[in-house]
Regions:
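Short S/T/G/P-rich N-terminal loop/turn motif that feeds into the first structured element of a domain
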Residues: 1-77, 83-93, 107-127
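Amphipathic protein-protein interaction modules
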Residues: 88, 96-102
Length: 127
């Protein structure tokens, strides 16, 4: 399936001190495993994931000039896109059933999240 206007997604951005990235990396590995075990790429059983990606990069003093040096933080971006609200709801239900993973997500979000689009519609796509 392709991503189009009206699909629903999440994007969460984190700024993590470099000395705390091991914890975030472990969470990302656990979350990816959860996604692979419980989500579908096709069919009619939700959650059907259209796109799942995680980005990681040093935070630069000037993001347009990598030669400007690093801040001592690492940036993470977690993006998920579903066809509609049914996929989002199925994802949330399954995620909350994994209590330890969900508790870690809540703690990491409370500690390091700088922006979150949760259940937001896609407003532009290469359709």
């Amino acid at each position: 399936m392709s991503i189009k206007r009206g699909n629903i997604g999440f994007h969460v951005s984190f700024v993590v001190p470099n000395d705390a990235t091991e914890r975030m990396d472990q969470f990302i590995a656990t979350h990816e495993q959860f996604m692979r075990e419980s989500h579908h790429l096709s069919g009619d059983q939700e959650p059907i994931i259209l796109s799942y990606s995680v980005f990681k990069s040093p935070e630069f003093n000037n993001p347009f000039d990598p030669n400007s040096g690093e801040t001592g933080n690492t940036l993470y971006g977690l993006t998920e896109i579903y066809s509609g609200p049914e996929g989002v709801q199925a994802h949330m239900t399954l995620g909350q059933q994994r209590e330890a993973m969900f508790a870690e997500l809540v703690d990491l979000t409370n500690t390091y999240c700088v922006a979150g689009l949760l259940g937001a519609p896609v407003i532009a796509a290469m359709e």
